[in-house]
Amino acid sequence: MPNTNITIHPRAIVHPNAKIGEGTSIGADAIVDEFVEIGDRCEIRARAIVTGHTKLGNDNQVGYGAIIGSEPQDTSYKGAVTFVEIGDRNIFREYATVNRGTKEGSVTKIGNDNLLFTGAHVAHNCKIGNRVILVNNVLLAGYVEVNDYAFMGGDSVVHQFTRIGSYAMVRGQTRLGMDVPPYCMAVDTNMVLGLNRLGLRRNGFSHERRRQILAAYDVIYRSGRNRSQALQFLESSAEFAENPDIQLFCNFIKASSRGICKLYERGASRIEEDRE
């Protein structure tokens, strides 16, 4: 640790072989282990632990009691060298946890500008994109993928190998074992209810872009076509075929191995779908 502008609390435990970037601070009772690399201007708050072969980029904040890089919670894990790779400008709030990969050389990856609230858990081999928000106590099982700009409400839980599409929103306490297509609102158990219209507006999607995405959503979920027929229609239609938003939507659905969430239908008690 040749840099001199690093602030390390006297009660912190930092291995001499750890690589710590310029301007980084490490709080009281924090632990930074031997194979850790921390970029510039990071803040490792009191009682946080960064362990394993973990690499953090620049300007990250690891909150009080958070644990990054711990062993996977997987009975097949036998001590293989595995990794956590984290980009820049991420915030891990109190007691968030990120496990490293399971199989030799495998990686848990988190991109840039993400926010993980208190108690959020990212299991082994997950992949999180950019500008994702995981609210309090979101639980991601192994190999889950959460794509860019997705928002996951508190206490939502995701089965292993499930994918959450870009710009999707998962309502609090939702249970997922099937993929959530891009732009959609996931509710209940493996169901969608319209688009994440608020998220789309906040991320600069024009009314026309939202209208076209909604039309494609209707083809998939409301046209009466089966999945392959709906995809064929979208990919051959002049209105949709060259639209990059629709291409993202279709490609995600085609790549699904677990199947995509179904349309929410509960008769008179159904949640109201806002189609603005």
Regions found by a protein language model. Give the residues of each.
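Structural signal for interior beta-strand "rungs" in well-ordered beta-sheet cores
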Residues: P2-V187, M191
